[in-house]
Regions:
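N-terminal Rossmann-like FAD-binding beta1-loop-alpha1 element of flavoenzymes
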Residues: 4-33
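C-terminal auxiliary extensions adjacent to catalytic cores
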Residues: 367-426
Length: 426
């Protein structure tokens, strides 16, 4: 490849990179898609859930071929305490309705499939390639260097993950800061489909997505559980700074979660087949760097720190695909290299990615209310236990009993301040 030249080189065969390469190849551009792992998906980690609208935006015909696991029809929220949980279960047989459906996915399968689709559309896909540096001439990015090979292109798209080496080398933004990311760990647990259906109240092809708080030893973060075909994806995301100070390995927290009385029956008998860890963007709009392009370079996906976490909804893959599509559309629409960056930013606006981040930018402030991750889930358990307790004694007045329980966990003044802060975040 030493003397190869391309219209575009895309670094990273995740959702952003594959979407970009696929869209460019469909329109006849000579595009090279590079993946550091031995194959696409080998180094990518996700819980994982894909909101299908993003795939439809890239190409509606992809949906029928995509390796979806299960269509999510149950949304579940768990507030865990030491001995039990308060669980909210929303069952929607329509799975969100037309255009709003989502599916559990296995990233290794999804990324491998998407890269194959890009290759079938005409892209060149090369795996096991570590990009060491960008090539720069006269202040412009003109290609990449991988080992002894130099590959040139009109445009390079950096889709190389949250700790993007290329974006840092280009001077677009510094090293990722611990407070700006979450440390995610995940186990894939094999379990027969009929057992999954019975435990989660599902029928064939239906899936459940569950989020939980109260399981991170008071640290900012939470848990997720997705049902797949023949397996479960169970994991935790915590603040890495707090995890480091706590001295507790995150893997230990994950094992504690599996043993929790509200979780253990769901995973009983499941066989662990994979463990993985990954950094994920956590700051939402405020974590997106001010500059996402230089002449000859665009930054997309996790590398651009695109992510949304409201506590109820966690979005990453859909934003990555949309940003990859935006990058491809900008390249296709721009007659000169100099104008691609501004066109890219316009497409991120027009495809609703940046407006969505702005609309939800305050949600991250909720994670600054430390009692959400310990005291309040415990309080929810106290209140429910009080409401349902019948022991033959004279019942306490409901309002007074709840007030007594609440103030035993959190002083009233602190609760009022937390409520006001939470209200402002929403």
């Amino acid at each position: 490849m030493a003397d190869d030249s391309f219209d575009a080189i895309v670094v990273g065969a995740g959702p952003a990179g594959c979407a970009c390469a696929y869209a460019l190849a469909r329109y006849g551009r000579n595009v090279l898609l590079l993946e550091r792992g031995n194959e696409p998906g080998a180094k990518n980690v996700s819980g994982g859930r894909l909101y299908a609208y993003a795939l439809d935006m890239v190409d509606p015909e992809l949906r029928s071929r995509a390796p979806f696991q299960r269509r999510i029809v149950r949304e579940q929220i768990m507030l865990l305490n030491e001995g039990g949980a308060v669980t909210v279960d929303h069952h929607d047989p329509l799975g969100g309705g037309e255009g709003a459906d989502s599916h559990s996915v296995i990233r290794a399968s999804l990324d491998a499939w998407f890269a194959q689709e890009a290759e079938a559309a005409g892209a060149t896909v090369a795996s096991g390639v570590k990009v060491d540096a960008l090539l720069e001439e006269g202040g412009r990015i003109v290609g990449i260097r991988a080992g002894e090979d130099e590959m040139r292109a009109d445009i390079v798209v950096a889709a190389d993950g949250v700790n993007s080496v290329l974006a840092r080398q280009a001077g677009l933004f510094p090293d990722v800061k611990p407070h700006a990311v979450g440390l995610g760990v995940k186990e894939t647990l094999e379990l027969p489909d009929e057992v999954i259906d019975a435990r989660f109240g599902l029928r064939d092809g239906e899936g459940a997505a569950r989020v939980a708080v109260g399981c991170t030893a008071g640290m900012a973060g939470g848990a997720f559980l997705y049902t797949n075909r023949g397996s479960l994806s169970l994991g935790l995301v915590v603040n890495p700074e707090q995890a480091g100070r706590s001295g507790r390995p995150v893997q230990e927290l994950l094992q504690d979660l599996k043993a929790h009385p509200a979780v253990a029956p769901l995973v009983e008998g499941a066989v662990p087949v994979e463990f993985s860890a990954h950094l994920v963007p956590e700051m939402g709009h405020d974590g997106v760097p001010a500059r996402l392009h230089r002449e000859g370079l665009l930054v997309a996906g996790d590398a651009a720190r695109f992510g949304i976490n409201t506590g109820l909804i966690i979005r990453g893959m859909d934003l990555a695909m949309v940003s990859g599509l935006a990058a491809a559309q900008a390249i296709l629409a721009s007659p000169t290299r100099a104008g691609v960056g501004e066109t890219y930013m316009r497409r991120l606006e027009e495809l609703s990615l940046l407006p969505s981040l702005r609309a939800l930018r305050n949600y991250h402030g909720l994670f600054g209310i430390e009692r959400i991750f310990g005291a309040y889930p415990a309080l929810a358990g106290d209140v429910m236990r009080f409401l349902f307790r019948v022991d033959g004694s004279v019942p306490a007045p409901m309002l007074g009993g709840i007030r007594r329980l609440a103030t035993s966990r959190v002083p009233f003044g602190q609760m009022a301040r937390d409520a006001w802060k939470g209200f402002r975040c929403l």
